[in-house]
């Protein structure tokens, strides 16, 4: 592919386009080409409020690994207090939503999906709570029980933005109420090096690139095989099933590279991360002499024109900016442990001040 200089190109993204990219819009058409999943929609208002509320009350059930003696709420100072410890009348009267009491049908379906698949990875509308993985002991999206799902969704800034965007789209529409959906995908232990983002415009593959921005020395020898697999999948499978011919797809190609899994479909718009490309570049790309799209891989000591728009994103674990020490995660599962951790910190600060 080649590019030419051009003014910054605008790309319109409509509520209708977002709907077409919703998981429930394409999942049935790609069964056998995407991991199994349970889609819960529409979601009751109580569930959406629960995900978006400040603080969380987990389901108290026998066998759960979470042992909350009382609910915890983050204060404005970033510390934690019990729900009844607020200073204002509104804080003292606030009662957190309870999964078992306030949305029992959704709670039951979450448990059923986990029982069916063994473990799940959650997603709300178009956002996966990857930025909240620090809340789970395994530091991943793998949810072994319903409370894992709730912790991820409630702690994710990505999900909070998704809720806000959905409400804004609804206000600008003629629909009676906003439609939210919870997707519980069967957990797959994927190799991040083999996940790729594919950019398709007008039925043509413009280019593809790694989703994980780290260097893997074994990818370069596989470049032609991976590119062929991506092109064949887009033309033979995706374009035959999707209503639009312009989109961004996330795919996974595990060894022996004979099967391509569709993970997600995103709008061809600036709100979708271009990763190793830039959006102005994608809007002006033209086929090269061979007519082959470029598969852009992270090179060793990656610098240059592909990296200039992504400085600071290489050689780093994805979402590492959201990580916290394991002690904090474990303390967050129990109020007594949290109190003990706070006391330990205070003792250390006191010793430091005395020195």
Swiss-Prot record:
Q: Which UniProt keywords apply?
A: Cell cycle, Cell division, Cytoplasm
Q: Where is the protein situated, by its record's location annotation?
A: Cytoplasm
- In which domain of life is the source organism classified? Eukaryota
Record flagged with keyword Ribonucleoprotein: no
Q: List the GO terms this entry assigns under cellular component, sorted alphabetically.
A: cytoplasm
The record's annotation in InterPro entries points to: CDC123 (IPR009772)
**One Pfam family this sequence matches:** D123
Gene Ontology biological-process entries: cell division
Which N-terminal stretch is annotated as signal sequence? none
Q: Which family does it belong to?
A: Belongs to the CDC123 family.
Q: What does this protein do?
A: Regulates the cell cycle in a nutrient dependent manner.
Query: What protein name is recorded for this chain?
Result: Cell division cycle protein 123
Q: Which species?
A: Eremothecium gossypii (strain ATCC 10895 / CBS 109.51 / FGSC 9923 / NRRL Y-1056) (Yeast)
